[in-house]
Amino acid sequence: VIIRSAAEVEADSRTSSQNKTWKFKIKNTRDFAWASSSSFILDAAQINLPSGKKSLAISAYPVESDGQHAWARSTEYTKASIEHYSQQWSEYPYPTAINVAGNEGGMEYPGIVFCHMNSKGEGLWGVTDHEFGHIWFPMIVGSNERVHGWMDEGFNTFINDISTKNFNQGEYFRAQSLQRM
């Protein structure tokens, strides 16, 4: 579901002259991050967790990153990644899973990840899945990634391979496997 379309971003109009106050809260975390921009398209979809609980996949990206082979699929990737890891390992603990297009290669925080705004297709799937995989390793298991980096990246890369094989009937798995040869 598109919450804020490219047309609304480009119109640069406000529906109200009054200020709004947004309050953010996240429980059981050791870190946090947030992002905002009047240039973001906002897209969202329901995440179905194994227990029957729901979460919300949200993507925030600029008009320049839009496109069916680019960030227009970010919410699909986020939803698939969270649902897979929740089914395979442990249920996702946060009410939202947000993927923000930024200028970094990829960075994870509880409930939110940042992926490069120019990522597309297999690259966007890979970085999205990898950064959300960090919710499980190291965040949920509680390991110290600065002391045990091999656990952080090693376990995460392992679960990423399984997730990529399962995503959309292996849409990106074959391409990824061929690149390793």
Language-model regions, residue ranges each:
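Residue-level recognition of alpha-helix boundary/capping or hinge positions
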Residues: 15-19, 176-181
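Zinc-dependent metallopeptidase catalytic helix centered on the HExxH motif
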Residues: 72, 114-179
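Hydrophobic helix-coil surface modules that form long, contiguous segments used
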Residues: 1-129, 158
